[in-house]
């Protein structure tokens, strides 16, 4: 990615990363949850009790304990101590002094404990846990006493256990063994032992034992003796005694601490009869259930009085029947009358038993068992259920009527549910049961804890899950990442689309057009690198042209790399249109050839005045730079159609891949004349090593692309057949001062372009050995054909180098300074777009010089030449930029000239209106030719269709065959040429391949009669 990508990664990344960091941190935070709830504990022994509480959450929650709903103070570490993990240690206080003081101290730590975990996201409260302290004092409240009983009588042993928590249970032992109770004869009422109809075997030692979690306590041993009854006479006397029960009165209970005792009644009776009073009286009572009910068995209680006594062991809310019976020993008297007494109801003295909670389908089921019968204190009319207020459920109560012992509570949110149950009588609700709690976990937590138990998700559970902070944070992070990825993709697509825009700089790493159009075996190419030196070169320096082919020691090693890549073409590359590139380069090195005398039929060309010829070559026009070219000898005949067929249509012809663009200006031919060759010494051919100024070992005819630098792995351009060069005509003899350079375009009748009329230019001037003459073309570039390349061939083995004066003269010419020429306006052609530079074909200067020496009229070849004259104005800035490249080429510095030409084509002249002319002049100065842009089209077949220029035939006798080159041909030629020059040998051996190529290029000098 380019700088935009760097900016994206370097500038836009920190903000998303910071947001992800913050949101990720929030995603880890969670509200507190109670994992381990405290359990009921009992302080016993000397060790402390532990209330455990575990919670989870992020940040880690703070644990706080509450006692009976109030925050627990940690100011007394001897009673409470909080461990770092949240566990609460409860120490048992030391019991000293009176029991009353001990109870006050214990009440400070007894109660219901709850654990509260809180952080910045919320608070969680655990279920309540009750702390109990097991206490059992030493002293019994009532000790059993020694008793003497008579067989058949009732026996009561009273026992008051010591105070303790929990309330101690009382059991009786006889002779060191637990006493076996017998319903109806041996029963325990309260804490007292009652024996009805005592028997002889009931005698023994009885002991009361109190037991709770704190331990057990034993009372003193009481001795019981059962004696035989008195004489039978006493029994008969008792039958005459009459007992009248007068009153049964309910006694008010005395305020006592601890469990409330049952109700008591006061019985009063009256004895009548002749017999003596009885020794003892027994009270009998039973509960009355209904009139139709036969009633329960009577309960006998021995009274301690003779006319009145207190009777206990009753229950509130019951209807009782009372009566009194006298007795003396084993003798019993008749029973008294029966009195009815209804005891009022009281609140139940005991809570319901077995309270449980279980979760159901969106509800909690509460179930319980009735309290013990002796603690009903009336008729149980229903139950009251209280719910402790917490975060899950507010405080509420429900009433269950009748004997139902179950309640269903609807739940809305997960959490902790704690309930208490109390029995209700006519007097009200009794004692509450111990709080029982149930924790309802969420579905995910429950499934995680117990994977085997699958709980189906409901809509409420799904909503609760989606509302959790971690789920919301995770969703936000995923959404942000998705948006970030979409943004990056859009950015990359738009960034990649910039490289495919129109213009010259549209090259990518893999140019499919170049891959398809280049073949190492068919097309020559430029050297691998173009070395150029920074700065301009002195235009006055001169060197051999052979230095262009070798390494220039003045060029630095870090010079620019070639614009062309020699990477092999990738197979299977589709044929795509190329609407913004020039075509590739072809370099043909033409070997030197001896000068050939011009034909006497060649018409004389118009010459410049001697004052111009003596100093420098005149500037051609505002469309071109001063150049010196030699005319090539006649070419071998091979039309593009034949070349196309010979190559079996393997080359992608330029005319097939781009539309034919018509020129906007008339066709013009430029000609330069090196100088008069009328003198004898000039007409003679110099030696190979003479080194004369007029000698040129070779000429380079090249055509290459001027455009942006291609990627190194771009494939080679497709090779094209070289078109025939313009016809070389012979002028008058070298002694004739009037030399003419005439050239015309030859086109078949099928050519859509109109044929240019014959133009003969005549000019006279004094001959000079060093004079150079030029016939200037019109300011427009020619556009002969878009299907062939321009090739320039030398006729003379000379390469002239301009002097600084000549270059300066060319640059100083203005539009108003015209050379004396006879202008013949050529036939106008169809206009071409300004961006199309057309086909430029010029003869070499040496050829023009030969034609000037030949003199004479115009033969058959004259009709094929066209030399429209024009003035030579001062070049535009774009032309001046390109002139630097041409000047470098004149000084044997082809790499620098190439770099100058490319640098002048980097886009600075794209807005110049003279760009077409300047580029044509510069290209023509180097022997280059540019093809028009191809139209946007897509080739569907790998083989090119027939060229639309296939029928365009050039001269029947002068045409150029299809050149087949190897990619390393130029390097081999350079090495061979340099080695031969270093050894003093001719540039080309007679039997070498270069000679054959040279013969191809130069050919034989046509005779005067072959002009047709």
Swiss-Prot record:
Tissue-specific expression: Expressed specifically in embryo and adult vascular endothelium.
Keyword set, alphabetical order: Angiogenesis, Developmental protein, Differentiation, Disulfide bond, Glycoprotein, Immunoglobulin domain, Phosphoprotein, Receptor, Repeat, Signal
- Cystine bridges: which residues? 53-115, 159-208
Query: One Pfam family from the UniProt entry?
Result: I-set
Q: Name one GO cellular component term.
A: membrane
Q: Which residues carry this modification: Phosphoserine?
A: 814, 947
Q: Show the segment(s) annotated as Disordered.
A: 533-553, 586-616, 711-801, 980-1012
Q: Report the record's Gene Ontology biological process terms.
A: angiogenesis; blood vessel endothelial cell migration; establishment of endothelial barrier; negative regulation of blood vessel endothelial cell migration
Biased composition range(s): Polar residues: 760-771
Segment forming the signal sequence: 1-27
Q: Which positions are glycosylated?
A: 201, 247, 361, 390, 397, 681, 713, 762, 783
Q: Where is the Fibronectin type-III domain?
A: 249-346, 348-443
- Any phenotype upon disruption? Homozygous knockout mice exhibit a complex cardiovascular phenotype that includes a combination of aortic valve thickening with or without bicuspid aortic valve, aortic valve stenosis, regurgitation and/or ascending aortic aneurysm. In general, these phenotypes are observed with low penetrance and male predominance.
Q: Which PANTHER family match?
A: BASIGIN RELATED, ROUNDABOUT HOMOLOG 4
User: According to its UniProt entry, what is the function of this protein?
Assistant: Receptor for Slit proteins, at least for SLIT2, and seems to be involved in angiogenesis and vascular patterning. May mediate the inhibition of primary endothelial cell migration by Slit proteins. Involved in the maintenance of endothelial barrier organization and function.
Full protein name: Roundabout homolog 4
Origin organism of this chain?
Mus musculus (Mouse)
Q: What is the lineage of its organism?
A: Eukaryota, Metazoa, Chordata, Craniata, Vertebrata
Q: Which gene encodes it?
A: Robo4
